[in-house]
């Protein structure tokens, strides 16, 4: 899908760049595949802010997207592509041969009327088809990749995202992630062929603060403009640099400080994303 620019009738319209969604379905989602979604405003069950700068925004309905793709060897037809306010990618409504319907992440170059299938065996390498990594040809681009067999896709699910299968080793697949990390994943984990739709998402410009508010994003206030009671960088006479290495409001180093401590999965990372690109 292309990008849309607007006549500069106001400063906001001059800067506004959005994705042209004219090719998407304009009606309501399938009711049996939706759930209610209450706005949390960044608060937990005690009513305390656990995520700053969230709140407000347009009311949403949650679409139940099938990340597991466990309906094996039943061909599905793409009914339509839809907008989903809960994610950056578009979603596709699939109607299976037995009449069941499901939403899946829409890959690039998938259109209404196309056929898709998921299997625990090898299937055609075409966008939307899902199969275990052990059957995917080396060099292929995939998305919605499982990290644990049967858990459902966790990697490469946002707009334009993909992972490349670069090799195999002793029942494991070697994946190159978009961060540059190379990672081992078990060959029985499912992946869907292709890259995720809406790759133009990275080029949009909201044009005005209000459009961020419609999305439920509140102003992101910098620590250096706060008072000392509110942030370690706060206070000082006039504009200051913060006076120390950047820290979070709770005094923890931020902006590049490594926090990964999951030793149990270290063995699956063949190449760190921090290693210099050769």
Swiss-Prot record:
InterPro entries on file: NA-bd_OB-fold (IPR012340), Rib_uL2_dom2 (IPR014722), Ribosomal_uL2 (IPR002171), Ribosomal_uL2_bac/org-type (IPR005880), Ribosomal_uL2_C (IPR022669), Ribosomal_uL2_CS (IPR022671), Ribosomal_uL2_dom3 (IPR014726), Ribosomal_uL2_RNA-bd_dom (IPR022666)
UniProt keyword terms in alphabetical order: Ribonucleoprotein, Ribosomal protein, RNA-binding, rRNA-binding
Gene Ontology biological-process annotations: cytoplasmic translation
PANTHER family (alphabetical): LARGE RIBOSOMAL SUBUNIT PROTEIN UL2M, RIBOSOMAL PROTEIN L2
Family: Belongs to the universal ribosomal protein uL2 family.
Positions of the UniProt region annotated as Disordered: 201-278
Assembly description: Part of the 50S ribosomal subunit. Forms a bridge to the 30S subunit in the 70S ribosome.
Annotated NCBIfam families: rplB_bact
UniProt protein name: Large ribosomal subunit protein uL2
Bias (Basic residues) ranges: 210-221
Pfam families: Ribosomal_L2, Ribosomal_L2_C
SMART domains: Ribosomal_L2, Ribosomal_L2_C
Gene Ontology, cellular component aspect: large ribosomal subunit
Lineage of the organism: Bacteria, Pseudomonadati, Pseudomonadota, Alphaproteobacteria, Hyphomicrobiales
Reported function: One of the primary rRNA binding proteins. Required for association of the 30S and 50S subunits to form the 70S ribosome, for tRNA binding and peptide bond formation. It has been suggested to have peptidyltransferase activity; this is somewhat controversial. Makes several contacts with the 16S rRNA in the 70S ribosome.
GO MF term list: rRNA binding; structural constituent of ribosome; transferase activity
Superkingdom field: Bacteria
Organism of origin: Allorhizobium ampelinum (strain ATCC BAA-846 / DSM 112012 / S4)
